[in-house]
């Protein structure tokens, strides 16, 4: 996907950033932040005909997410040591 200044609309690129709210001086917490890609466009007529609930606008997006996700005692632990643009969590179902 495009990841240039024009498509981000002035938003910083996807990267790790120190989370000041959760971090402690001896234990910094890092979080993936920034923009990747999103766009919206009119839904093509042939696509609307196949939709259960037709919609006029179609959107595509990728979000800035942690590259690594591991399990710890059946609890999801997101290791934010590296970030990349991927499917937005709220689009996964």
Swiss-Prot record:
The protein's GO terms of the molecular function aspect are: follicle-stimulating hormone activity
Q: What is its main location?
A: secreted
Listed under GO cellular component are: extracellular space; follicle-stimulating hormone complex
Which biological process, per GO, is one annotated for this protein? positive regulation of steroid biosynthetic process
Where does it live in the cell?
Secreted
Q: Which Pfam families match?
A: Hormone_6
PROSITE patterns from the UniProt entry: GLYCO_HORMONE_ALPHA_1 (PS00779), GLYCO_HORMONE_ALPHA_2 (PS00780), GLYCO_HORMONE_ALPHA_3 (PS50277)
Which residues does the record list as glycosylated? 79
Going by the entry's taxonomy, the superkingdom of the source organism is recorded as Eukaryota
Instruction: Quote the function comment for this protein.
Output: Shared alpha chain of heterodimeric glycoprotein hormones. These hormones bind specific receptors on target cells that in turn activate downstream signaling pathways. Involved in gametogenesis and steroidogenesis.
Q: How does it assemble?
A: Heterodimer. Glycoprotein hormones are heterodimers composed of a common alpha chain described here and a unique beta chain which confers their biological specificity to the different hormones.
Q: What name does this protein carry?
A: Glycoprotein hormones alpha chain
Q: Which organism is it from?
A: Muraenesox cinereus (Daggertooth pike conger)
């Amino acid at each position: 996907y495009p990841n240039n200044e024009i498509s981000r609309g002035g938003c910083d690129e996807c990267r790790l950033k120190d989370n000041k709210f959760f971090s402690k001086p001896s234990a910094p917490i890092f979080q993936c932040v920034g923009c990747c890609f999103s766009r919206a466009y009119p839904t093509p007529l042939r696509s609307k005909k196949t939709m259960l609930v037709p919609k006029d606008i179609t959107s595509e997006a990728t979000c800035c997410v942690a590259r690594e996700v591991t399990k710890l005692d059946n609890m999801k632990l997101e290791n934010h040591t590296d970030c990349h643009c991927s499917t937005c969590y709220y689009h996964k179902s």
